[in-house]
UniProtKB/Swiss-Prot annotation:
Binds 1 Mg(2+) ion per subunit. GO terms for molecular function: magnesium ion binding; monooxygenase activity; ribulose-bisphosphate carboxylase activity. The keyword Lyase applies. PANTHER family: RIBULOSE BISPHOSPHATE CARBOXYLASE, RIBULOSE BISPHOSPHATE CARBOXYLASE LARGE CHAIN. The basic functional RuBisCO is composed of a large chain homodimer in a 'head-to-tail' conformation. In form I RuBisCO this homodimer is arranged in a barrel-like tetramer with the small subunits forming a tetrameric 'cap' on each end of the 'barrel'. NCBIfam families: PRK04208.1 (NF003252). It is an enzyme of class 4 (lyase). The gene is cbbL. Coiled coil: none annotated. RuBisCO catalyzes two reactions: the carboxylation of D-ribulose 1,5-bisphosphate, the primary event in carbon dioxide fixation, as well as the oxidative fragmentation of the pentose substrate. Both reactions occur simultaneously and in competition at the same active site. This is Ribulose bisphosphate carboxylase large chain.
Length: 488
């Protein structure tokens, strides 16, 4: 859509650099003939221009304000390789079914970015343009990160393959639960919840995002009681177990102190929240790599900027940044649970985490091929409002390289925490066996679970309690190309 002639890129240097105000397209931030290089960082924005603002000019403004431009001509541009360093909007298309919205593609020269720094990347790409007055709204939908850039990052400290080898668990999803209530328990009672869940068959139990070090339970007490529970459950079951010890704190120094104590106690995993920021995430990732620890990422706060379709950042972009930054586990949605998540869109997030090369797939919201250049894979985590009665849907949607995390669906079991864990483990093992036997678990799943429940009282009680519970609401973030329905 549009071309240089539509607005008129000024080629004459005297006119281009004369003092005053020019349109962004006139300054060279629009080039409809540009062919992206393999080394370019590419970004796809969804923009909603103000009334009367040409979409090509809006795209050029995004390119300019996220690279080298300001509101007026500055002569110091001539002291730089300005033609190279300018980001270039090179394509604009209307968003299907969304009047007034446009997709715009922008290419960035690799030299604009510091190697190995998500903080620097985000400072450019999202640092300024989202407040720009000529746009009613702006959303970063997807990015293509060139191999040359990807190779400057270390990625996940452990990765899926090595994690499974350390745990000695193969051929099935991993099982987890979040301790409930998330706040208010004493350290001793908290540890009891962890033990009961692990003893019943879970692989992991986790701290929730906001349990740090509060008056009712100091972080050190939590760590001690949780690791006592982990060690006891491991000894009794013969399986490797873990608890995601949340080391999120007010300073990096305190986070390192908590991480060191977790290691001293023998933990295999620590956890941080997304809200600690990109520099902290990369720093803790480096610590985990050096100390042979898994890093679990809770995406606390992401919905403030990922959920709305018109403005913010798609979670697929956040997932790409986190794979570069280096996390081993990432909450990526359930599609069937209580939290926002269109099934096809969520599958796209999983693809970003687990594939060697993520291929363009408009139905799942993926606009670019992404070669991960051998970067380790992230284990997705499905968490939030899921229960044993949905086991067939979860495995059908997400396969086996995933952590299925049943918090309330374990701890809320009418016969107790251990019974809740048993119900989930039996449902999981039953569904994997049925899948391996060639059964159609998507359609036969409820029948398979009911049959298994005849021999497992905890599973029967779980199905009786939650079997009909669904969260069947329309998703707000869906593909613009293929309408999809909830699976619940």
């Amino acid at each position: 859509m549009g071309a240089d002639a539509a607005i008129g890129q000024i080629k004459d240097a005297k006119k281009r650099y004369a003092a005053g105000v020019l349109k962004y397209a006139q300054m060279g931030y629009w080039d409809g003939d540009y062919q992206p290089k393999d080394t370019d960082i590419l970004a796809l924005f969804r923009v909603t221009p103000q009334d009367g603002v040409d979409p090509v000019e809006a795209a050029a403004a995004v390119a300019g304000e996220s690279s080298t431009a300001t509101w007026t001509v500055v002569w110091t541009d001539r002291l730089t390789a300005a033609d190279m360093y300018r980001a270039k909007a090179y394509k604009v298309e209307p968003v299907p079914g969304q009047p007034g919205q446009y997709f715009c593609w922008v290419a960035y020269e690799l030299d604009l970015f510091e190697e190995g720094s998500i903080a620097n990347l985000t400072a450019s790409i999202i640092g300024n343009v989202f407040s720009f007055k000529p746009l009613k709204a702006c959303r970063l939908e997807d990015m293509r990160l060139p191999v040359a850039y990807v190779k400057t990052f270390r990625g996940p400290p452990t990765g899926i393959v090595v994690e499974r080898e350390r745990l000695d668990k193969f051929g099935r999803p991993l099982l987890g639960a979040t301790t409930k209530p998330k706040l208010g328990l004493s350290g001793k009672n908290y540890g009891r919840v962890v033990y009961e869940g692990l003893k019943g068959g879970l692989d992991f139990v986790k701290d929730d995002e906001n349990i740090n070090s509060q008056p009712f339970m100091h972080w050190r007490d939590r760590f001690l009681y949780c690791m006592e529970a982990v060690n006891k459950a491991q000894a009794e079951t013969g399986e490797v177990k873990g608890h995601y010890l949340n080391i999120t704190a007010g300073t990096m120094e305190e986070m390192y102190r908590r991480a060191d104590f977790a290691k001293e106690l023998g933990s295999v995993v620590v956890m941080v929240d997304l809200i600690v920021g990109w520099t902290a995430i990369q720093s803790i990732s480096n610590w985990c790599r050096e100390n042979d620890m898994l890093l679990h990422m809770h995406r606390a706060g992401h919905g403030t900027y990922t959920r709305q379709k018109g403005h913010g950042i798609s979670f697929r972009v956040i997932a790409k940044w986190l794979r570069l930054a280096g996390v081993d586990h990432l909450h990526t949605g359930t599609a069937v649970g209580k939290l926002e998540g269109d099934p096809m869109t969520v599958q796209g997030y999983y693809n970003v985490c687990r594939e060697d090369v993520t291929r363009t797939d408009y139905t799942r919201g993926i606009f670019f091929d992404q070669d991960w250049a051998g970067l380790r894979k992230v284990m997705p985590v499905a968490s939030g409002g899921i229960h044993a009665g949905q086991m067939h849907q979860l495995i059908d949607l997400f396969g086996e390289d995933v952590v299925l995390q049943f918090g309330g669906g374990t701890i809320g079991h009418p016969d107790g925490i251990q019974a809740g864990a048993i119900a989930n483990r039996v449902a999981l093992e039953t569904m994997i066996l049925a899948r391996n036997e060639g059964r159609d678990i998507k359609n036969e799943g409820p029948e398979i679970l009911v049959e298994a429940a005849k021999w497992c009282q905890p599973l029967r009680a779980a199905l009786d309690t939650w079997g009909e519970v669904t969260f069947n609401y329309a998703s707000t973030d869906t593909s613009d190309f293929v309408p999809t329905a909830s699976v619940a």
